[in-house]
Regions:
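Short N-terminal edge-element motif at the start of the domain
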Residues: 100-102, 108-118
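C-terminal, well-structured catalytic/ligand-binding subdomain of enzymes
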Residues: 1-101, 126-280
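Short arginine-rich
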Residues: 117-125
Length: 280
């Protein structure tokens, strides 16, 4: 229930992402480079719901992006386990952070992914995860464990998109896929990319919409289909402050427009108690 697209524009390589899911909430993490196993990791930004070790998406300091969506297993059953000889075994979501900490390009990311035996943690829900990987040079990969990786370049064609079908499947009946494909030419920058995400939102299920510029390392974020309020961040500026995390509840309350709404509301005294008339 997700949509991820990538498009080359004059302002940079843009990735747009709707996280459509059953569970609300989320947390942003800014992770500076650290020494790990004797080597420095790449600094990165991630968004997650299940813990800092299991992000749904992220981008590192070099402009490498990895995001995931699910596919039904009846459309693309997992292959027989041929990864038993791989030394690294990892959760699919955990692999996103692991790879972002180490890779610079799409090709490097795929090479690292190929060394990992990925645990299909969503099989109990009849789902598999597939990934869109993109770098700041416009190199794209569609990756799903056990399947052949598809490489593309944003230099050729209007853009690339994944939803909830394998890239090799006939997806003519997916409204979100078709809508994005038909409106790629409208994506000129961050604002128009966000408008395209708004077109393919799913009212009860879109938890966040994010646009990443893989060259300037900017991110724009809207929460729970509230496209009137856009949270804008410079990943580089935030990383300079050191490690930080910010949950969606705190993020929404910190927005100046939200603060102004509280300041504009009146309060009435009733039954010897202060009762806020917020209309929320």
């Amino acid at each position: 229930m997700c949509t991820i697209f990538a498009k080359k524009t004059t302002s940079g390589i843009l990735v747009g992402r709707n996280l459509d899911w059953l569970q609300k909430g989320g947390t942003l993490h800014y992770m500076p480079s650290q020494r790990l196993y004797g080597s420095p990791t790449k600094a990165l930004f991630m968004i997650e719901q299940m813990g800092v070790d299991k992000p749904y998406e992220g981008v590192n300091e070099t402009g490498l992006f990895i995001g995931c969506a699910v596919t039904p297993i009846d459309l693309n059953p997992p292959p027989p386990d041929d990864n038993r000889d791989k030394a690294l075994k990892m959760d699919e979501l955990g692999a996103i952070r692991f790879v972002l900490e180490r890779a610079t390009t799409t090709q490097e990311a795929v090479k690292i992914m190929d060394t990992i035996s990925l645990n299909n943690s969503y099989l109990d829900y009849f789902l598999r995860i597939h990934f869109l990987i993109a770098d700041s040079d416009g190199n794209i990969a569609f990756y799903q464990s056990g399947d052949q990786t598809i490489f593309k370049s944003l230099e050729n064609g209007p853009g690339e998109v994944i939803t909830n079908f394998p890239k090799s499947a006939n997806i003519g009946n997916c409204r979100r896929y078709n809508t994005v494909s038909e409106h790629f030419d409208e994506v000129k920058g961050m604002e128009t990319a966000l408008k395209l995400l708004e077109q393919v939102k799913q009212d009860d299920y879109t938890i966040w919409s994010a646009v990443f510029n893989l060259n300037s390392l900017e991110v724009w974020l809207c929460i729970e289909t509230d496209y009137k309020i856009t949270h804008k961040f410079s990943i580089q500026d935030e990383l300079k402050k050191g490690y930080s995390s910010l949950d969606f509840g705190t993020l929404k309350l910190s927005d100046p427009e939200i603060k102004q709404q509280f300041a504009a509301h009146s309060y009435e005294l009733a039954s010897s108690e202060w009762v806020p008339c917020l209309g929320l």
